[in-house]
Amino acid sequence: MAVGGTGSQERVDPLVANRHWWNSTVPVHVASDFYDVAGWLAEGRGPRAREAAVLGDVGGLDLVHLQCHFGKDTLGWARAGARVCGLDFSDAAIAAAQDLARRAGVADRAEFVCAPVVDAVALLGAARFDVVYVSLGALWWLPSVTERAAQVGGLLRPGGRLFLHDVHPLSLALDDDDLTIAYTYFAQATPYRDSRVGSYADPAAIEALPGDPTFGWNHGIAETVTALLDVGMRLDRLDEHDWTSSARYPWLVETGEEEFVIPEGHHRIPLSFTLLATRV
């Protein structure tokens, strides 16, 4: 995760640095076994079964995916019958998403917009969507869950739903090498600085990715939930999971497709969580 402190962050805009890193990951991720774009295209896969079980039938609904990266998950919902819009601050990711939509044959019901989350309502329109979808690894990259919640509430029609699945903030407080607490669970104004090389999708892609740092902010569960309640959302369910979808720590053990857990012999803690909320 992070290496503590922020070093020379005063001379670096964290969001600019993050955008630079995400732009550089796009070709690596599109080609990676982790994302398996070729298999996804060939097999016509839709959304993950566990996510579809929570959201149910999305046929004919308007769905927006915030921080969509290169759009693979977004387009899975298009294959399930939704009209989708993906938003991401990486122009390289948006270009790749538009190309993937064409290759998947769903470009007629998929729109992709390059913009930061804080501009979502202004650019996409208020009360336009039935579903806001946010998937793993999103909350960390924005300093304010309050601003994000305002965008979520503004994008949804009355009765519209937020689906959020993300890394559990407790797991983000763990040391990279063991199960000790190394970082704060609660939000702080100063971001963490992460100077690791490679990527979660391809840790060996050292030469293809810059060694420049990225920056992130941890957000406790209560902070995230309260921000949503404050903008008129109703919390429908909150589930904590003892698994996560990627091997973000070297000591995790793979037990199934996109499922990694703490090894036997250690106490279990939540590694990810799922939240469903409704705009009232």
Give the residues covered by each predicted segment:
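A short acidic, Gly/Pro-enriched loop at the edge of an enzyme's catalytic core
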Residues: 118, 122-132
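Class I SAM-dependent methyltransferase SAM/SAH-binding core
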Residues: 61-121
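Conserved class I S-adenosyl-L-methionine
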Residues: 161-203
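Conserved alpha-helix/loop element of class I SAM-dependent methyltransferases that forms part
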Residues: 33-62
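A short glycine-rich, Lys/Arg-flanked "PGG" loop and its adjoining helix->strand segment in the class I
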Residues: 146-161
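A short SAM/SAH-binding and catalytic strip from SAM-dependent methyltransferases
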Residues: 130-146
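Short alpha-helix
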Residues: 214-238
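N-terminal, positively charged/glycine-rich alpha-helical extensions of SAM-dependent methyltransferases
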Residues: 1-37
